[in-house]
Amino acid sequence: MQQGQKQNIKTDKSYYLTLTIVNWIDVFTRKNHRDAIIESLKYCQKEKGLVIFAYCIMSNHIHMIVNTNEPFLLKDTIRDFKKFTSKKIVEQIQNEPESRREWMLKLFEEEAEPSKRHKYYKFWQEGNHAIELFSENFVWDKINYIHN
């Protein structure tokens, strides 16, 4: 599936998702940015019905196996998660010590320029590379991949 292509996420299924930073920038090498992700995941669990079976925060992307409880929709929960975390982490980069601040903000700004949805900065790549979990073996393959 090409970057930015819409995916049909079904309401009653679990998915293996990969959320990636634009230009594969190593944002999550900083603990405060990883903490922002974890706090937001916890919020989504409590307030948006997110069910997390497995996840791993890599230096420039996140893998997770997730679904949502009714009445919530996974696509909406992930959209809100990405929107909130992009704003939060960009604010952290702007306001907290960060040796790569100017470089990262310039790249985020350049990514936002051709976009109508992103006013100043674009943090996440489009799409979630959603793969429906279709068998027990596939689920265990993905869990082992995430945790190894």
PLM features per residue range, with description:
Residues 1-148:
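Short catalytic/metal-binding and nucleic-acid-binding patches
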